[in-house]
């Protein structure tokens, strides 16, 4: 079974995949947002390519656990993604995922400019790895 991780941003959408047997997530690509229909189509193409059986969308909660506008955006997007993909979609707390993604990319020696094109997909991998780790026995 493969799972798709989604870091939903206002400008870009990061995507990652995980093989649940290996229990590791990896960044795949970043989709530059256009219309929602185009966004869903681009995500669905990646989902088909990787034969995913479920998706996990990051839920950007505030540090105190409350939901702001970005969390409401993710909550609204998740059911539409589920319909577009035809697989179950779950939400997962993504607090500090972008910070962790930037830290990982810096550790690999990437400059801030080089990180720009990769941070969203890496954040999706962070979200998905957190989801996998939470499910571990």
UniProtKB/Swiss-Prot annotation:
A GO biological process held by the record: rRNA 5'-end processing
Keywords in alphabetical order: Cytoplasm, Hydrolase, Nuclease, Ribosome biogenesis
Location(s) in or outside the cell: Cytoplasm
Family matches, as Gene3D superfamilies: YqgF/RNase H-like domain
- Report the superkingdom from the record: Bacteria
Enzyme's top EC category:
hydrolase
GO CC field: cytosol
- Under which EC number(s) is this enzyme classified? 3.1.-.-
Q: What does this protein do?
A: Could be a nuclease involved in processing of the 5'-end of pre-16S rRNA.
The entry's protein name is Putative pre-16S rRNA nuclease
Tell me the organism's taxonomic lineage: Bacteria, Pseudomonadati, Myxococcota, Myxococcia, Myxococcales
